[in-house]
């Protein structure tokens, strides 16, 4: 009986800690040089964007992904090394989405952009 209870406690803890949202991004986005663009990373229902750190990556053909930035709140955000300040993050709570804004678009910004999350209670 004690082993069964311990196993159930461990399983429920592990199941909860592994639960992650499904992330949805638009398939494509186009804009002109000099314009600003807003890319979204929507979390699935049952999850709140405010509980997660959103990370953004840029990938150009033939290259590995480049880490751009993370965003959790205005007081908890960070820019990757060498990433210009025209790349910025935010959250849109009404859309339950993380946002990557690129201002002053340049030709070299043409790339694939990916988001990822980690939970605010995570220690890793």
Curated annotation (Swiss-Prot):
Keywords: Adaptive immunity, Cell membrane, Disulfide bond, Immunity, Immunoglobulin, Immunoglobulin domain, Membrane, Secreted, Signal. SMART domains: IG, IGv. Its main location: secreted. GO terms for biological process: adaptive immune response; immune response. Residues 45-53 are annotated as: Complementarity-determining-1. Residues 116-124 are annotated as: Complementarity-determining-3. Disulfide bonds join 41-115. GO terms for cellular component: extracellular region; immunoglobulin complex; plasma membrane. Residues 1-19 form the signal peptide. SUPFAM superfamilies: Immunoglobulin. Residues 54-70 are annotated as: Framework-2. Residues 78-115 are annotated as: Framework-3. Residues 21-124 form the Ig-like domain. Gene3D superfamilies: Immunoglobulins. It is found in: Secreted; Cell membrane. Residues 20-44 are annotated as: Framework-1. Residues 71-77 are annotated as: Complementarity-determining-2. Immunoglobulins are composed of two identical heavy chains and two identical light chains; disulfide-linked. V region of the variable domain of immunoglobulin light chains that participates in the antigen recognition. Immunoglobulins, also known as antibodies, are membrane-bound or secreted glycoproteins produced by B lymphocytes. In the recognition phase of humoral immunity, the membrane-bound immunoglobulins serve as receptors which, upon binding of a specific antigen, trigger the clonal expansion and differentiation of B lymphocytes into immunoglobulins-secreting plasma cells. This is Immunoglobulin lambda variable 5-52. It comes from Homo sapiens (Human).
């Amino acid at each position: 009986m004690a082993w069964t209870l311990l196993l159930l406690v461990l399983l429920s803890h592990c199941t909860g800690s592994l639960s992650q949202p499904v992330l949805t991004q638009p398939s494509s986005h186009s804009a002109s040089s000099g314009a600003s663009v807003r890319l979204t990373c929507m979390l699935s229902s049952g999850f709140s964007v405010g509980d997660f750190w959103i990370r953004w990556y840029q990938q150009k053909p033939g290259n590995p992904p480049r880490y751009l930035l993370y965003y959790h709140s205005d007081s908890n955000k960070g820019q990757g090394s060498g990433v210009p300040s025209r790349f910025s993050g935010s959250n849109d709570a009404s859309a339950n989405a993380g946002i990557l804004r690129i201002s002053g678009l340049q030709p070299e910004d043409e790339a694939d952009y990916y988001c990822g999350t980690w939970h605010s209670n995570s220690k890793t």
